[in-house]
Amino acid sequence: MMKKTLALTALACLISAPVMAKTWVLTSAESATDLGNWKVTSNMLKVKNQNFSIEQKVLHGGKQEGSKVIIITSKDGLTITLSPSRGMNLLRVEGYGVRMGWDSPVKEVVNPAFMNLESRNGLGWLEGFNEMMVRCGYEWTGHPVTADGQIYTLHGKAGNTPASQVEVEVSDSAPYEIRVRGLVKESTFKKADLQTMTELRYVPGSNRFALHDVLTNHADYPHDYQIIYHSNFGKPILEAGARFIAPMESISPFNDYAKAGLKEWQNFAGPTKGFDEMVFNIKPLADENHHTTAAVINKAGDKGAAIQFDTRQLPVLTLWKNTDTEKQGYVTGIEPGTSYAYPVTIEREQKRVKQLQAGQSTQFDLTYTLLHTSGQVDDVVKKIGEIQGSTPIEEIETPIAKE
């Protein structure tokens, strides 16, 4: 009996014991500290069975003067580049001969200090847009509109807000999970005090990473929120004959221009001059755990990018097909969100804008997987097929709104 009790006590201790980790604070607005150029490696941490590094670089020149990037490099896995200066956005992810990301005419990591989001009638956001993943929100998102005595600029402000607190954490034991956290504040006197603790989680050697973001309303009053995880992919995944796959209840064109592409929503053209962009609104299906997956896969079916998300947190999905010329920006977007990309005025009317009470928090969990073998692609195709089941996809020809 004594041995059994001791064994149970030991097991309880193991279950309740916190995971030990080393933490570095790279930036803190509260304590006015910034480590600037900084690096830690698996060798420095005396990790023997993994080869990885985490580095922060301060950039110089042009409109990226003073911008910071953090680069996670795993020799047998992914290289993930994100920017604390730009709302902890992900610039690109590379590994196994595949890239998640795209080639924008914007080549620099533009410092928000040089941005004017209200320029070009609310389209200033485009002057810095080159990321693999941008958080479009959280106070509002979508196309610009003037209402309520203000300009709601394109896709909100979070993606152009430098993080106030940036931390890197590495677990002390296998599998040595890396976490990069950044606190993004949208705080305006009399308007809002929304704060998002963003977190990227990556296990060295893996072909996937996760985002775990917690949005909190720090004000004494309720406040609306919206978010679109604008996730963008170009070559080598995107090409003529590439395909988009996702389980869905319905799909409809965003506007009249996209009507012409409705029957070909699943297929991508090569770079096409004058194509501009077509956008489609999707109502996704999910499994019994409310999880769903959307993916873009190349023509051969041996490369791709998949995003898993929770439809309780992110109930709608936008497909953005921008298969214009390569210099203009040959890219597609898979965009889980609380809203579609219509202006906030339309999203309010159609009751997709959500609200947080004073002091309330909500969270968003997404997993991104870089697919680099036909077997991995087949697994995702099978998973999506199982969620779709026998449910027919309804192709709705009329846009649900008109700007």
Language-model regions, residue ranges each:
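N-terminal secretory signal peptides that target proteins for export/translocation
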Residues: 1-2
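Sec-dependent N-terminal signal peptides
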Residues: 5-14
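N-terminal signal peptide c-region/cleavage motif recognized by signal peptidases
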Residues: 16-18
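Surface-exposed acidic/polar loop and edge beta-strand patches at domain peripheries
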Residues: 22-210, 222-224, 233-271, 283-403
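An amphipathic, aromatic/His-enriched active-site/gating alpha helix that lines ligand/cofactor pockets
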Residues: 230
